From Swiss-Prot:
SUPFAM superfamilies: Prokaryotic type KH domain (KH-domain type II) (SSF54814), Ribosomal protein S3 C-terminal domain (SSF54821). One of its GO terms (biological process) is translation. This is Small ribosomal subunit protein uS3. One of its GO terms (molecular function) is mRNA binding. Binds the lower part of the 30S subunit head. Binds mRNA in the 70S ribosome, positioning it for translation. Coiled coil: none annotated. It holds the Pfam family KH_2. GO terms for cellular component: cytosolic small ribosomal subunit. Keywords: Ribonucleoprotein, Ribosomal protein, RNA-binding, rRNA-binding. HAMAP family: Ribosomal_uS3_B (MF_01309_B). Belongs to the universal ribosomal protein uS3 family.
Amino acid sequence: MGQKINPNGFRLGVNRDWEAKWYADKNYADTLNEDLRIRKFISEKLADASVSTVEIERAANRINISIHTAKPGMVIGKGGKEVEALRKQLSALTKKNVHINIVEIKKPDLDAKLVGEGIARQLEARIAFRRATRQATQRSMRSGAKGIKVQTAGRLNGADMARREWHTEGSVPLHTLRADIDYAWVEAATTYGQIGVKVWINRGEILPQRKNKPSKKTKGGN
C-alpha cells in the first residue's frame, strides 16, 4: 500500500499537517474553488521564486497564507513592496482580508517539489535526463538526505517510444510512517512532449516524544 499511495496523504496526521486549515459546511465547494484560485495565482505570479508549499488558514473573513520559498527576498521585494502588492491582489481576488507570511526553505535540495522543478527545467533545456537526475540526487544526499528516488517517464531523450526510468540513492522506506518522506510530481514541457518527474526524498525519521512515566515507589521506601 505504501508503494502506491501518495506519501504526503499517507502521513497526514502522523508527521505531516494539512496545507488547508479551515471548515466549511454549505459553502465548501465555493471555499475550495477559492483555494484553488489562490494557489494558481501565487504559482503563476511567483513562478521564478522557488515556491514549494502554500498553506491557507481561514478564520471568519480573514485568510492567512503561508508561502514556503527558497528565495524569500524575491517574494518580499525591496522594503516589502512585492509582498504588499501580492497581498492587495489576493485581497481583490478573494474580497477578504489577506495576511501573508513568508517562510524560508533553508535546504531547497531536501524539498521534493523544488528538486523536481530543477530536474524539469534541465529537461526543458535539453540536458540528458540521466545527468539531470544524477546531479539532483547527489546534491540532495550531500544536503543530508537519507535517501532519494526519482522517476522520469515519457519520451526520454526524444526516443520514439515512451518509457519510465528510476534513479535511487540511499533508503526510501515508503511503508514506514515515522519516516519523513517528501513527495512531489512535476511535468516538463519538452519539444518531444510532456515528461513526468516524480521525486521521493527521505529526510530521516521523526520519533514520537516519550512521556516520562512516574517512578514506582518501592515498599518500605521514603
